[in-house]
């Protein structure tokens, strides 16, 4: 999900190429082992959750939708308490001590990816499949490209909660490694006359502006 508030106007009015990239990347490696549905509008995903609660839900986390994503995570947990909720995006601190505080303030978020989401989320999905949806096995070991507070320690005081940090993953240097979500049709339903398509021609940046994450060195 790459959610936008839509009560009065669309806060984010672009076709969600971000989740399109991630879905295309995961399908490239796992194909029919997984079933993926993409969402932009909150009511659509809420209806889908009620009708068929997912085993896992992944949501983007930006300054304009982070709270909305946490709310949808809580709804998912309501209909399937065992569902794995993952957030990813730029609205996340770089320092580990701040990441822990961030997750402590979002109790319905199980896992947060670090930096680019394709490889990190693929790591999560593989772990879920290997664990046969058993929550205890999913969180037994660190997950590459991700951080989480171990579920068994969430009931402890914040100081004693165990913060697990996965191995850092390299940037994807060749964008052709990711199948085009426009060419494979996974974004077709978002051409609804409300959203504007856009393209990504590169990643990274030689500059390190304080207000932007694109030039972050990792």
Q: PLM features: residue spans?
A:
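Structured loops at beta-to-helix junctions and adjacent beta-edge loops in soluble globular domains
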Residues: 1, 149-151, 168-169, 181, ...
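Short glycine-rich His-centered loop
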Residues: 1-11
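Proline-rich low-complexity regions
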Residues: 3, 16, 54, 81, ...
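A structure-centric signal for secondary-structure junctions around beta-strands
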Residues: 4, 16, 140-143, 195, ...
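Glycine-rich beta-alpha loop elements in corrinoid/cobalamin-binding modules
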Residues: 11, 18, 25, 29, ...
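Radical SAM [4Fe-4S] cluster-binding motif and immediate context
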Residues: 14, 160-162, 176-218
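Conserved post-Walker A coupling segment in P-loop NTPases
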Residues: 172-174
């Amino acid at each position: 999900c790459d959610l936008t508030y839509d009560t009065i106007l669309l806060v984010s009015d672009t076709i969600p190429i971000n989740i399109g990239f991630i879905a295309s990347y995961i399908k490239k490696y796992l194909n029919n082992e997984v079933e993926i549905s993409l969402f932009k509008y909150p009511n659509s995903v809420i209806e889908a959750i009620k009708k068929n609660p997912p085993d896992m839900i992944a949501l983007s986390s930006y300054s304009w939708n982070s709270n909305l994503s946490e709310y949808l995570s809580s709804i998912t947990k309501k209909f399937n308490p065992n569902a794995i909720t993952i957030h990813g995006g730029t609205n996340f601190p770089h320092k580990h001590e701040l990441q822990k505080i961030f997750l402590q303030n979002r109790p319905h978020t199980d896992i947060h990816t670090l930096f680019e989401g394709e490889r990190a989320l693929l790591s999560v999905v593989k772990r879920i499949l290997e664990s046969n949806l058993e929550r205890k096995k999913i969180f037994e070991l660190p997950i590459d490209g991700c951080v989480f507070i171990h579920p068994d320690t969430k009931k402890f005081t914040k100081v004693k909660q165990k913060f697990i940090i996965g191995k850092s993953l390299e940037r994807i240097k060749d964008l052709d490694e990711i199948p085009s979500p426009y060419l494979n049709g996974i974004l077709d339903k978002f051409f609804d006359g409300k959203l504007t398509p856009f393209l990504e021609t590169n990643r990274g940046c030689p500059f390190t502006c304080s207000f932007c994450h694109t030039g972050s060195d990792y």
